[in-house]
Amino acid sequence: MHHTLIVARMAPGAAPDIAKVFAESDSGELPHLVGVNRRSLFEFGDGVYLHLIESDEDPAPTIGRLTGHPEFRQVSERLEPYVSAYDPATWRGPKDAMARCFYRWERTPAG
């Protein structure tokens, strides 16, 4: 299982609106095109947005290819009032919002 963590800023009180955008999008074809198995959205502290994507493979290349897809553009446009780049000076595209995992541990099956 691959985990991708997207980090951004979110407007105060926007969690229900953001969740609605994704609930509607997740009922369409976009999660299947990207390869999303599970999505979790988190808010941390004063306006930090965390978006965890769980998938079989790294979704970054597919997300990069789908930025022009009508459903991807629609989600992005609907999120604009609520979500913004964590660091606007360095953001050029979706990959720039993806955190780099530097440690992972998994329990081995007992046996």
Swiss-Prot record:
Classification via InterPro entries: Dimeric_a/b-barrel, Polyketide_synth_cyclase, Polyketide_synth_cyclase_sf
A Pfam entry, by short name: Cyclase_polyket
Gene3D superfamilies given in the database record: Dimeric alpha+beta barrel (3.30.70.1090)
GO biological process, one term: polyketide biosynthetic process
Superkingdom of origin: Bacteria
The protein, known as: Uncharacterized protein SCO5314
Organism: Streptomyces coelicolor (strain ATCC BAA-471 / A3(2) / M145)
